Amino acid sequence: MSNKVKPHINIVVIGHVDSGKSTSTGHMIYKCGGIDKRQIEKFEKEAQEMGKGSFKYAWVLDKLKAERERGITIDIALWKFETTKYVVTIIDAPGHRDFIKNMITGTSQADCAVLIVASSTGEFEAGISKNGQTREHALLAFTLGVKQMIVAVNKIDNTEPPYSEARFNEIKKEISAYVKKVGYDPKTVPVLPVSGWHGDNMIEPSPNMSWYKGWEVEYKDTGKHTGKTLLEALDNIPLPARPSSKPLRLPLQDVYKIGGIGTVPVGRVETGILKPGMVVTFCPANLSTEVKSVEMHHESLPEALPGDNVGFNVKNVSIKDIRRGMVASDSKNDPAIEAASFKAQVIILNHPGEIHAGYQPVLDCHTAHIACKFAELLEKIDRRSGKVIETEPKMVKSGDAAIINLIPSKGMCVESFSQYPPLGRFAVRDMRQTVAVGVIKEVDKTVAVAGKVTKSAQKAGVAAGKKK
């Protein structure tokens, strides 16, 4: 089993609506991936019959997406491909209405963002314009803590003339300046010309760009790397550190009821370790129970580590008691406690008016989606230096950064960014867009009351509500 040895990394694919994300993503999965060849042949045949032959890679992705949305499989294995060094999981294939929202909840899971920009005339400009998605996606990726970025300049076969060196250099210059402005160090961001459709520089170096000498990056820990393809760029990402020594935090993505097994919550271990036999507490339900088994890709695991997307079976818990957005933690080691309120540094990205105390948008934090009130605007700060410009401002508007005290409208489990990064960043959504992003500085936790403890948890010897 090659998978056992290779570390897993998660990537998120971002970029403007027609940049070719689906085709490029489809291509990678198709050529290096976990899709069974028979399945591909079936998809191809269907694509031909429906006159979608030219769309084959994107079509593969659409089929997978449809299956995922209809809940036919809980099998994330399809969204995988391997490089020499890593097993890569694509966490969210774009094109979703809620892509930005998923990106906020999902990006906390991404080790690397692959930003795809279209090089054809007009398309690049549209994506990078003031309200283009390229900008918003890149800024979100950085704010939400995605350490690595790779930029693929796509549709290079579609430039004037095709495979134009001048056009690539023009885009490379602009995109490097932009990722720098967002906060990335351009020295660590490979920018490469590709065709997701024809496959140029995706997996093998392109025969069509003799001018292209390759990308070069320099990482702090691993030094200089060069290469020509997207596959090599992914292969050279520094291995992300996994916070397995911290206490367990596992935000639930879904909860399934599986015949003959019972209730199976599914989510990704963000910090700590999940093992069978452990007694977990679900917050904010304040319910403790024993973990019977842990599975990943249909194989049972002795333990799940940060980065693992797993399902785990819990005893005596009804599917009605737990839901997406709750957090599982170890009842004996700094268990998660509901937040009464929390203080956060918030950057207002695009809000048409003024935001005053009392504003109540929806926050997306890890997998939770909950309305929270901006209870007090404490300080307005300079985005660059972090210095306080004004205390107790009357209002904030687009472009401002502020320290704000927030109160959730119902039970919500969040943590400070410094302790548990994935549970300490959020997006503020209103009017179907991302109005702001924030990082949690400190959390005022509710006083723990004795929660419900299932029989299996009592057997495993838990004192309810015993919190530090």
From Swiss-Prot:
Organism placement in taxonomy: Eukaryota, Metazoa, Cnidaria, Hydrozoa, Hydroidolina
Family stated for the protein in its record: Belongs to the TRAFAC class translation factor GTPase superfamily. Classic translation factor GTPase family. EF-Tu/EF-1A subfamily.
Task of the protein: This protein promotes the GTP-dependent binding of aminoacyl-tRNA to the A-site of ribosomes during protein biosynthesis.
InterPro entries: EFTu-like_2 (IPR004161), G_TR_CS (IPR031157), GTP-eEF1A_C (IPR054696), P-loop_NTPase (IPR027417), T_Tr_GTP-bd_dom (IPR000795), TRAFAC_GTPase_members (IPR050100), Transl_B-barrel_sf (IPR009000), Transl_elong_EF1A/Init_IF2_C (IPR009001)
The protein, known as: Elongation factor 1-alpha
Chief subcellular location: cytoplasm
PANTHER family hit by this protein: TRANSLATION FACTOR
5-glutamyl glycerylphosphorylethanolamine, modified sites: E303, E376
Gene3D superfamilies referenced in this protein's UniProt entry, alphabetically: P-loop containing nucleotide triphosphate hydrolases, Translation factors
Location of region: G5: 195-197
Annotated spans, G2: 71-75
Region of interest called G4, as start-end residue ranges on this chain: 154-157
ATP-binding keyword on record: no
Cellular component aspect of the GO annotation: cytoplasm
Pfam families reported for this sequence: GTP-eEF1A_C, GTP_EFTU, GTP_EFTU_D2
Molecular-function annotations in GO: GTP binding; GTPase activity; translation elongation factor activity
Domain tr-type G: 6-244
Keywords, comma-separated and alphabetical: Cytoplasm, Elongation factor, GTP-binding, Nucleotide-binding, Phosphoprotein, Protein biosynthesis
Span list, region G1: 15-22
Keyword GTP-binding: yes
Cited SUPFAM superfamilies: EF-Tu/eEF-1alpha/eIF2-gamma C-terminal domain, P-loop containing nucleoside triphosphate hydrolases, Translation proteins
Cell compartment(s), UniProt: Cytoplasm
Organism of derivation: Hydra vulgaris (Hydra)
Region (G3): 92-95
